[in-house]
Amino acid sequence: MSEKRNIRDHKRRLLAAKYELRRKLYKAFCKDSDLPSDMRDKLRYKLSKLPRNSSFARVRNRCISTGRPRSVYELFRISRIVFRSLASRGPLMGIKKSSW
């Protein structure tokens, strides 16, 4: 199940990267008050016709091993649960249990 979620998230990331420039241009032109309103409406329509999954708001950071969507460390791309187990076993280089 986690494999399917990660594949779906990867596809969303690829689509978001593909349409990033076009989406930013349309948004900037839509907000430009110097342009005529009919032109801005056309650009707003084009923006709405872009694929829904091409928005970065739909991209979710997921754990690469379990697919868990919550509490994912962005640096390692793993969840806190997997991070704790890997850190205690030792495969994460440079990570050790703190003591003071």
Swiss-Prot record:
The keyword 4Fe-4S does not apply. GO terms for cellular component: mitochondrion; small ribosomal subunit. Keywords: Mitochondrion, Ribonucleoprotein, Ribosomal protein. The keyword Ribosomal protein applies. It holds the Pfam family Ribosomal_S14. One of its GO terms (biological process) is translation. SUPFAM superfamilies: Glucocorticoid receptor-like (DNA-binding domain). It is found in: Mitochondrion. GO terms for molecular function: structural constituent of ribosome. PANTHER family: 30S RIBOSOMAL PROTEIN S14, RIBOSOMAL PROTEIN S14. Belongs to the universal ribosomal protein uS14 family. This is Small ribosomal subunit protein uS14m. It comes from Vicia faba (Broad bean). The gene is RPS14.
